[in-house]
C-alpha cells in the first residue's frame, strides 16, 4: 500500500507500471522433514511445491497495476503467462524502443494484462532437470517429471 500510495502522491500513477510477483512454489527443503517440521509456505489447493513441475511448484502469484490502463479489481484465470512472457508484455505496454537485432523470448500478452482475451501462439514448456541428487523435494510425493508442457487452455 505505501509504495502505491507514494507513486500516486507524486502524480506518477498513470506513468508507472507496478508488478507484484514471487518465485514459484513454496519451499520443500528436505531438512524440514528430517527435523520433523512441515516446510513454510502454502500452495493452497495446488499439488506440488518448489522443485516440482506440478502446479503447486510452477504457478506464481502475479498482480499488476497501471492506473488508467490496466483494469482494477479484475482477475484472469484463463491466460497462461510464464515469467518469460513478462518482458515482451511490459515492453509492448511501453513506448520504449529495442535494438533491432534483439529477439525476445516469450510472448507479448499485454492485451491479457489489459483485460482482453489472448490465445497463446504456442505451448509453454518447463524443464527441471538439474542434478536430482542435489535439489530433490523433501517429500517424495512431490517428485515430478523433469519436463512439462502446457498447450491450449
Per-segment meaning from a language model:
Residues 26-32, 39-53, 70-79, 84-153:
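C-terminal cap/loop subdomain of S1 sulfatases and analogous C-terminal strand-loop tails that border
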Residues 59-63, 87:
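Structural micro-motif
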Residues 21-24, 58, 66-68, 128-129:
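Active-site-proximal beta-strand/loop segments in catalytic clefts of secreted hydrolases
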Residues 3-6, 66, 89, 93:
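Generic, well-ordered alpha-helical scaffold segments in large soluble proteins
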Residues 64-65, 150:
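Short, well-ordered beta-strand micro-motif
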Residues 12-18, 58-60, 118-122, 151-152:
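Loop/turn elements at helix/coil->beta-strand transitions in domains of secreted/extracellular proteins
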Residues 1-31:
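Metal-dependent active-site segment of extracytoplasmic phospho-/sulfohydrolases and closely related
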Amino acid at each position: 500500500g505505501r509504495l502505491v500510495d507514494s507513486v500516486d502522491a507524486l502524480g506518477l500513477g498513470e506513468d508507472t507500471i507496478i508488478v507484484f510477483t514471487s518465485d514459484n512454489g513454496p519451499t520443500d527443503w528436505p531438512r524440514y522433514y528430517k527435523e520433523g517440521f512441515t516446510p513454510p509456505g502454502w500452495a493452497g489447493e495446488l499439488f506440488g511445491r518448489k522443485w516440482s513441475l506440478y502446479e503447486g511448484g510452477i504457478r506464481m502469484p502475479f498482480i499488476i497495476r497501471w492506473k488508467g490502463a490496466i483494469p482494477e479489481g479484475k482477475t484472469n484465470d484463463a491466460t497462461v503467462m510464464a515469467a518469460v512472457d513478462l518482458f515482451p508484455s511490459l515492453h509492448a505496454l511501453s513506448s520504449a524502443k529495442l535494438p533491432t537485432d534483439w529477439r525476445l523470448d516469450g510472448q507479448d500478452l499485454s492485451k491479457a494484462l489489459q483485460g482482453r482475451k489472448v490465445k497463446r501462439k504456442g505451448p509453454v514448456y518447463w524443464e527441471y532437470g538439474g542434478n536430482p541428487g542435489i535439489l530433490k523435494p523433501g517429500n517424495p510425493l512431490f517428485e515430478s517429471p523433469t519436463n512439462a508442457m502446457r498447450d491450449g487452455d
